[in-house]
């Protein structure tokens, strides 16, 4: 493993860990929430605004950036860091999630995936080698192996095929990876079948990569099933490497995953709901979301959250934000995105602090209560 990607666990509380993941663009203190900048931008936020939220590491998408503006253009600017002027660590997804999300626009074979580009209708071919080459050109600190993300629900035969293809593609990604200053992570698939999750994890772990991800969750399955799949999968991954849960970012989901040893998270949710006029509030009663379109906020002169240190809460009232939302002003999206991203980064920091003081289970008990235990497929 490249020395610059060392992962150090500094504190433990049960299975929960607080650590530091070293990257060429600085350390990442875990647990860590990563905002999503699909098109090399976290929507409506400048890099300076993003940094002020406490964001440490962000995510960009290989598939979309390969289409627009093209990996060669990004590389010509010195990679993503120079292109988007983000000084901190960056992670790029491989395009594997688009195998799921663009299922009506793609065909899969053992060599790779052919997508039909939504705007032009042009055919775009992605293979493991191409996914790695594009990510090498984009220059992120962490890059992901190309995988097949099956939908939910899916029958066992379909998921088993996705696992076998993911493992074969993974071997090709490892062979194609050329840059020692980028950490390649493998992605565990397997749907809701524990034995398939184990089969996939064992195949990936044998390569001794700098880190591993849990994929194929939050693709339509119920919340209790997400929790169970993560609980089954996390222990299959090396405990001295960072563990990344892809596409998950609510308070409850993060706390539940941290409790079983997950370190990294990403999700589009905080900025997506901000663009629709909603704010996330961090309290003792679990997830809470308020919609500023509601009439009750028109004369509410309090900040969104009186203890939140973000720019939005330091300067503006709910009444002003409600006015911006009702007026469909772009500033509403920016101010709510600042607050929502800051809230999730603050939540991750609170998780870290509780782990360090040995109070994680007590302080986050209201998030750790599970619903009825789902039955996973045999």
Curated annotation (Swiss-Prot):
Single annotated GO MF: metal ion binding
Claim: Oxidoreductase is one of the keywords in the record: no
One protein family per Pfam: TGT
Cofactor section: Zn(2+)
Keyword DNA-binding in record: no
Biological or metabolic pathway of the protein: tRNA modification; tRNA-queuosine biosynthesis
Co-factor: note: Binds 1 zinc ion per subunit.
Binding site for Zn(2+): 308, 310, 313, 339
Residues holding substrate: 93-97, 147, 189, 216
Catalytic activity: 7-aminomethyl-7-carbaguanine + guanosine(34) in tRNA = 7-aminomethyl-7-carbaguanosine(34) in tRNA + guanine
Biological process annotations from GO: queuosine biosynthetic process; tRNA wobble guanine modification; tRNA-guanine transglycosylation
Enzyme Commission numbers on file: 2.4.2.29
One GO CC annotation: cytosol
Region described as RNA binding: spans on this chain: 247-253, 271-275
Active-site residues, record numbering mapped to chain: 93 (proton acceptor), 266 (nucleophile)
Subunit structure: Homodimer. Within each dimer, one monomer is responsible for RNA recognition and catalysis, while the other monomer binds to the replacement base PreQ1.
Family: Belongs to the queuine tRNA-ribosyltransferase family.
PANTHER family reported in the protein's UniProt record: QUEUINE TRNA-RIBOSYLTRANSFERASE
HAMAP family: Q_tRNA_Tgt
Function: Catalyzes the base-exchange of a guanine (G) residue with the queuine precursor 7-aminomethyl-7-deazaguanine (PreQ1) at position 34 (anticodon wobble position) in tRNAs with GU(N) anticodons (tRNA-Asp, -Asn, -His and -Tyr). Catalysis occurs through a double-displacement mechanism. The nucleophile active site attacks the C1' of nucleotide 34 to detach the guanine base from the RNA, forming a covalent enzyme-RNA intermediate. The proton acceptor active site deprotonates the incoming PreQ1, allowing a nucleophilic attack on the C1' of the ribose to form the product.
The protein, known as: Queuine tRNA-ribosyltransferase
Gene (UniProt): tgt
């Amino acid at each position: 493993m490249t020395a610059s990607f060392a992962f150090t666990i500094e504190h433990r509380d049960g299975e929960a860990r607080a650590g530091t993941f070293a990257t060429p663009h600085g350390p990442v203190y875990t647990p860590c929430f990563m905002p999503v900048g699909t098109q090399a931008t976290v929507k409506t936020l400048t890099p300076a605004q993003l940094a002020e939220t406490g964001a440490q590491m962000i995510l960009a998408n290989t598939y979309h950036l390969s289409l627009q503006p093209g990996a060669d253009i990004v590389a010509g600017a010195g990679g993503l860091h120079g292109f988007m002027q983000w000084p901190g660590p960056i992670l790029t997804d491989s395009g594997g999630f688009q195998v799921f999300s663009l299922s009506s626009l793609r065909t899969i074979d053992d060599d790779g995936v052919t997508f039909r580009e939504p705007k032009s209708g042009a055919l775009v071919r992605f293979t493991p080698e191409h996914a790695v080459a594009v990510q090498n050109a984009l220059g992120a600190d962490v890059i992901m192996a190309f995988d097949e993300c099956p939908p939910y629900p899916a029958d066992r035969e379909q998921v088993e095929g996705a696992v076998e293809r993911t493992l074969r593609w993974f071997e090709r990604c490892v062979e194609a990876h050329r840059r020692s200053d980028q950490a390649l992570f493998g992605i565990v698939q397997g749907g809701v079948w524990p034995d398939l999750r184990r089969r996939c994890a064992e195949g990936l772990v044998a390569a001794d990569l700098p880190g591993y991800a849990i994929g194929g969750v939050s693709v339509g399955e119920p919340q209790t099933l997400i929790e169970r799949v993560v609980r089954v999968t996390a222990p299959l991954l090396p405990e001295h490497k960072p563990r990344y849960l892809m596409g998950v970012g609510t308070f409850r989901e993060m706390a539940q995953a941290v409790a079983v040893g997950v370190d990294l998270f990403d999700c589009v949710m905080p900025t997506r709901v901000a663009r629709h006029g909603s704010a996330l509030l961090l309290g003792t009663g679990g997830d809470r979301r308020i919609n500023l379109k509601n009439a009750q906020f028109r004369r509410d002169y309090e900040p969104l959250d009186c203890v939140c240190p973000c720019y939005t809460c330091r300067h503006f009232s709910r009444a002003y934000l409600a006015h911006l939302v009702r007026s469909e002003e772009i500033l509403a999206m920016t101010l709510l995105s600042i607050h929502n991203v800051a809230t999730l980064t603050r939540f991750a920091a609170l998780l870290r602090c509780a782990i360090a003081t040995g109070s994680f289970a007590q302080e986050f008990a209201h998030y750790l209560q599970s619903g009825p235990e789902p039955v996973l497929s045999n």
